[in-house]
């Protein structure tokens, strides 16, 4: 199937469901506790990421689509952290705050990329009045091309049938990531996306492909669905529709590091593609490609348009160009096996100008390969203000990747690339400007690993800020 990426900016999607905050505590472990036979983790890094329905909304926003999110939260620090994280990535939150319940939070403790324990903080939202959710759906329906209902059985979708009927009345497709074995409650939905174990919990164990298809088609008929997409892990996914032959899409995953949130990516990309005008078959193809990308990342993750474009064109393993962190680590390892010296620099690179090009060319001359780490849009706004960046992340990375001096381009979400630099550990870390070497983010980690840190001069009188001001003066 030949599929091109749609213009996701035309797509509006509303996600309704169980939102939660995923917390990750990372650190080394080198001893066993004297209190009990358990490892002691010295926590040195803490991350917070939106999870559940919130991760679906993030996946939609990461494609450039208009992403709206409705869910239930408490009135607490977790709710504030969740809202803040989502606002950073342009998700429009419209939460219903419930003062008697805490925001659902899941805490994972990890060491050496291994999850040691997960702690859940939740009470569920059973018994909460669904009317405020109905009202939010009704208000959003005229502005969206798809409704996603993300069910984690925490209470936000207890009245899911009413939500389905609201969408059907407005002729908006409703896509559901189901939970549990009672699919009757999803009757009349446009599409269900159960994984294989969820599917077999309803129809029984399928001995072969023929049984899976026949039982799936019966389920479609019994519950008046327009379609059913069964995600099957390493076996890919299968789309079933009345009157059409089954469509099987083999997995595109190269390596599997973590399946956390992969189902969220599937339904998020699928909904965004549908809302942008793709057919259901094309949308499933894109969702399958996105799943192959996201399982190669650690933790709850999203996929960018460039990663998706690379996946559908088979460029994810080419070894050069725009990459995610896992792909970059593999490329760097291969470069070192060839005895190549790896140089790394970073910046926003909002409006690429002659000063940038000269600086990057000089940085490249200091080694064999040049990595350029680029601030995300959210990071740029925090550093430069709400009117920046002028050019979105994907466009900035494409332009950088086209330069002869640049081998690899990788994005980062934080204000500084210190974590990324510590993970990659380049042979030479380069920064432009009037910094002192010990002021450069990541310098301590590079020195500790035996690497070098160097400061290069920028070309005088040329800057993105000056260019923007000149444009404003000209327009004025």
UniProtKB/Swiss-Prot annotation:
Stored Pfam families: CTP_transf_like (PF01467), PfkB (PF00294)
What keywords are annotated for this sequence in UniProt?
Answer: ATP-binding, Carbohydrate metabolism, Kinase, Multifunctional enzyme, Nucleotide-binding, Nucleotidyltransferase, Transferase
- UniProt organism field: Yersinia enterocolitica serotype O:8 / biotype 1B (strain NCTC 13174 / 8081)
MF-aspect GO terms? ATP binding; heptose 7-phosphate kinase activity; heptose-1-phosphate adenylyltransferase activity; phosphotransferase activity, alcohol group as acceptor
Q: Which gene encodes it?
A: hldE
UniProt xrefs under NCBIfam families: cyt_tran_rel, PRK11316.1, rfaE_dom_I, rfaE_dom_II
Q: Which residues form a coiled coil?
A: none
EC number, UniProt record: 2.7.1.167, 2.7.7.70
List the protein's name.
Bifunctional protein HldE
